[in-house]
Amino acid sequence: MNAVNELPLGQHNIEIQRNREAWSRKPMLRKIYYDFYRLLAVRLDPHLSGPVVELGSGMGRIKDVIPQCVTTDLFSNPWLDRQENCYQLSLGDNSVSHLILFDVWHHLRYPGTALREFHRVLQPGGRLILFEPAASWVARLVYHFFHHEPVAVRDPITWEAPAGFSAADADYYAAQGSATRLFWWGEGHDRLPGWKIHEVRPITSFDYFASGGFSGPQLGGRFLHGLMRGLDFLAAPFPRLFAARLLVVLEKEKS
């Protein structure tokens, strides 16, 4: 399935509202996401000063685990701290210790253009933490048949925005395989001047599959949740087959 590119930008906010409703009625999903947020929390470098900023916060629930995190989105929803656009941030140069993008990278039509802006605002040694879908063999099947956003592992990735592009031109876009291709499979390793790859970690999460995410039905309850954790342990040595999620940490190089 090809990358989504024909929907208006407001589709993102429609999905945020739907996700808030799903969050309120799916306890298994909440538990899984809090575990994911804790994975991000332990990757914050305590030696860095400056704000921790999440871009594309959506529901803003990361504050439940990282309370000091500044939550932002394209849309000025009242539960968020501020409005930001990844292509043109209002943050100062070298002012931020960490940027967190949770399920946001694959919505960037021009990731190289956004990455240059992230590099501008991060202080030297600052971290860009991405949490994304993993395009393992099993995950591709699950996301293809049970999620509305395409994986798009064969579509071209347009790294830089065309001449004349402005942040106001940002539109709805989705290609879930983008981070996998660029960081796990290595297609983007030669496109990272000024960055150091600190970590690329595929994560098995059968309980995430079983939860149905935000858009699908939840399968089972607490018992199934425990069973899925057991499957995660068994499948962990085979990430290219079974990984559901991908954690990427980039560091801005120190001059």
Positions of PLM-derived features:
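Acceptor-substrate binding/catalytic loop of class I
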Residues: A167-G186
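A short glycine-rich, Lys/Arg-flanked "PGG" loop and its adjoining helix->strand segment in the class I
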Residues: G112-R127
